[in-house]
Amino acid sequence: GFSQGGVMATSLMRARPQQFAAAVNCSGFVAPGVFPGDAELTELRPPVFWGRDVADPVIGAEAIARTAEWLPAHSQLVSREYPGVGHSVSRDELDDVFVFLSQNVPGALPIR
């Protein structure tokens, strides 16, 4: 998901870890607090793609710091930075998401 969609993707994964093969979070963050599946995720460690611009003008430093701490402890994190994108998505990021989904979601055929 993008922005709030990324928050939703990770929040739903945190609520029902067994139902997710992977998650994508572009220019987003993880919600604060403890979710029912957080402990289980430390064992399952599903793949999560997190793409962003380090200078994103919308997502605050606290949310970025929380996400940077939480994701590596609860997932197989693939983290990418896209300088100059701002709070948006670039062609390079979409290409990286395509590769990530192709490698991590069995049977997935994302539209390219």
Question: Where in the sequence are the language-model features?
Answer:
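Primarily recognizes the serine-hydrolase "nucleophile elbow" in alpha/beta-hydrolase
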Residues: G1-E43
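Residues at the starts of beta-strands that form the adenosine-phosphate
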Residues: A21-A22, P47, Q76-V78
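Alpha/beta-hydrolase-fold catalytic nucleophile elbow
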Residues: V24-S27, G51, P83
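Acidic catalytic loop of the alpha/beta-hydrolase fold
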Residues: P32, V54-I59, G86-S88
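Juxtamembrane loop segments immediately following a transmembrane helix
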Residues: E40-L41, D53, I64
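Short, hinge-like loop/turn segments at secondary-structure boundaries
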Residues: E40-L44, D96-V99
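Short beta-strand/loop motif that positions the catalytic acidic residue
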Residues: L44, F49-R52, D56
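C-terminal catalytic histidine-bearing segment of alpha/beta-hydrolase fold enzymes
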Residues: E62-R112
